[in-house]
């Protein structure tokens, strides 16, 4: 149904009958922002689109934004497909595919452990320039030759900017193809998705550059508490040491990041495309069978490690290559999985409830407030499903 009504004047797009609570939650989020916000939210239920909304002075249905670390989720959906087809094995050593990796005590690290941020290779002491960070081959070469910061497989620490450069090197060694090429050929291309690891030049005019956070004392305190020293693991993981680095929120603004599409952080797309991709991974979409079998979904959605994250400095549960989404959003069913992105981006699937969800915002936001926003939208989405009598 087309949106009308004074309460939702800022919201454009459509929701299916019964999913009006999501529209209302999105309108409330916009009203609470305190300034005009460019944002998109999309969802699918049982494979069909039920939410496709956008707002903001510059945003349309096809506007493109940086998805930051939600790119990892896209990359790891590719890894899941390759595991399903027997090209990769979660219980094989990384060094089996990448022999040069077997140095500095890393020789026994398993692929599933690499995917769950257990490698101890969160960055380099000297850091990376933006140009270097956008080059997955260079990042993988440096980290593959490096001694880890902890004994691999014994702890976890968020490999914020480099995780999928490492898994991408495994993919490249096993397939002789680049991650971006395989994502396009196996995932986004067949589905016709406006989601890119390597933005085509002709799509540049639709890209919206990111905007900095609206600073408040509370938000600044949260950022400072999570930053730590540049010399500590958080500083290394978030690349705070290199003189030619940049703030995380600025990364998609760099043309080299957009054009190369590094597999950890360089994805550009729409909320509609992300929601469709996660739907297609778990359910039939547009006449196509689900990309992943139930046993593959279960293997990747299971919790691989849970405990104190050495980078995030808080308790964190990691599935295999994904966030264990129900640990963050308890309203979701067990087995939900996805990946957030810096500043408030989110994409996930709840297979038991047959839902997929994606949200993109242009202006950076601290994690606690982003999580609260997603919780409200997801609660509204599940309320809509329960209205149909179908929620798990």
Regions found by a protein language model. Name each.
Residues 26-27, 47, 66-92, 167-172, ...:
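Active-site SXXK
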Residues 210-269, 298-353:
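Active-site Gly/Thr loop motif
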Residues 64, 123-206, 256, 260-269:
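Catalytic-site signature segments of enzymes, centered on catalytic residues
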Residues 61, 69-70, 82-126, 144-145, ...:
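Active-site helix/loop module of the DD-peptidase/beta-lactamase fold
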Residues 12-68:
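Short, conserved catalytic-motif segment at the N-terminal edge
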Residues 262, 283-286, 296, 301-308, ...:
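Short, gly/Ser/Thr-rich active-site loops of penicillin-recognizing serine hydrolases
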Residues 117, 163-170, 261, 265-285, ...:
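Active-site-proximal alpha-helical segments within enzyme catalytic domains
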Residues 4-7, 57-59, 145-150, 250-261:
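Short glycine/proline-rich turn/loop motifs
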